[in-house]
Regions:
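Catalytic cores of carbohydrate-active enzymes
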Residues: 1-99
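Non-catalytic C-terminal accessory modules of carbohydrate-active enzymes
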Residues: 63-201
């Protein structure tokens, strides 16, 4: 018996953001998926928002991801603050789930998305022996973070201006790091502590 697939015109936000992580195969077009995701907004649960945000950063759509982190409608983390939650909600608002609890870890996606994706700090090897530092600030002009690891804190500050990009990073002495900078168009100079350096593209 041959396996076949039924075609359909239906597409869901959930199906699309999952596909960014699994890259289904020949014919799959990332930009088409990202374009569709942008038409749906936060049409997923608080739980699903974790996977949506990961997919946006994985697809290098940091600008839309920043928009989703900072938007203020009723399907937003801002709304959780506005309605009086001091932690994170089980659902976006009481109108979506009147019996929700107001102390729900699955609503706290920004707590890991900001350090891992926006600031771009992730372990490349076990125990953070080597870290990857790859900020994706999009139009955010400034960010600062202290990110704890088992080897000590990584401290970062990023200035992201039209004509200058400055990344200050301090890592523990027992850690190595691969540091990524955005590649600007046109002529540019990269310096490390004021000394020009060659850049691997």
């Amino acid at each position: 018996m041959a396996l076949g697939f039924r075609t359909t015109d239906h597409a869901s936000l959930h199906g699309q953001y999952v596909s960014v992580g699994v890259r289904p195969g020949p014919g799959w077009k990332k930009q088409n998926v990202v374009d569709f995701i942008q038409t749906r907004g936060m049409a997923c649960s608080v739980y699903g928002s974790q996977f949506l945000m990961d997919a946006l950063y994985e697809a290098n759509d940091a600008e839309y991801a920043l928009h989703m982190l900072t938007k203020t409608d009723d399907r937003s983390w801002y709304n959780m603050i506005r309605v009086g939650s001091t932690i994170s909600l089980e659902a976006w608002d009481n109108k979506y789930k009147p019996n929700q609890d107001w102390n729900h870890a699955w609503g706290a996606a920004p707590a890991n998305i900001i350090p891992r994706r926006l600031m771009g700090v992730e372990p490349l090897t076990p125990g953070f022996a080597t870290a990857r530092i790859k900020p994706q600030l999009a139009s955010l002009e400034w960010a600062e973070a202290t990110i704890p690891t088992i080897r000590g804190a990584i401290r970062m500050e990023v200035e992201n201006k039209a004509d200058t990009y400055v990344l200050r990073v301090t890592i523990p002495a027992n850690m190595d790091a691969e540091v990524y900078l955005p590649l600007p168009s046109g002529k540019y100079t990269v310096t490390n502590n004021g000394v020009p350096v060659k850049v691997a593209k």
